[in-house]
Amino acid sequence: MPLIRRYLHRYAKAGSAAEVVLLSKTRTEAPGGSQMTGLQAHLEDLVIANRILAHENVVDGFGHISLRHPERPDRFLMSRSRSPELVTLDDIMEFDLDCNPIDQRGRVMYGERAIHGAIFQARADVNSVVHNHAHEIIPYSVTKTPMRQVIHTAGGMGAHVPVWDIRDDFGDTDMLVRNLQQGRSLAKALGDNAAVLMRGHGVSVVGRSVRDAVRIAVYLMVNARLQTEATRFGDVTFLSEGEIAKTAEMSGSPLASDRIWEYWARRSGYVSDKTKA
């Protein structure tokens, strides 16, 4: 039985409700009062991440987030094909890096999981990938205007956000990344950056953790909106390379990361103080 299925089996035996009861910031207690394992805590974060991305309007009915398996780096975890706001623990599936399901059990899979598998193959430093279609970002994927950091809280987006055009390598398509060949082309365009725009489609964002990827995805969208608004007033003063580096370090610190995660998780409505140890 796959590791994730063994955990979900234990979760069900604990008698928890069908709805996920997400844990507090400490995330040390599992359903039924037992101590959580590292895998359990990561799975909880993945569910919370889906809810946060939906609540913060980074995703709507479409979009997805993945997690490299914390105990099997040659695999990754993500929901079955479902709108992020509705994702629960029972929806989480396990895949190898070629995007084959380990334990499908008849569940429908995201058609663009190749985005995640290809990036995990190319980037050993990446442990989470967010793909979204935030409207604020799209204009920067279809014009020659580069997206650049204008606000300190967007630390981590990097000095360069490349644009990938699927038509360059694959001609006319439906714009979706449907196979690993297309996914690897996208991963090549991403390079060692934190995000890659996808012409007329959206963006893929990477992070060292689920929390890291969510934070960058949210503030990349915010930065795009502010950059667009700022250009209406004239020339824009962007952050310097030094400021970009220092704000990335600040935003990615445990203090800042935990603080914003707790805030977003509570806003999404799926954190319960009753589960605190």
Predicted regions located by residue number:
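Segments surrounding the PLD/"HKD" phosphodiesterase catalytic module and close analogs
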Residues: A12
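Compositionally biased, low-complexity intrinsically disordered regions
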Residues: G15-S16
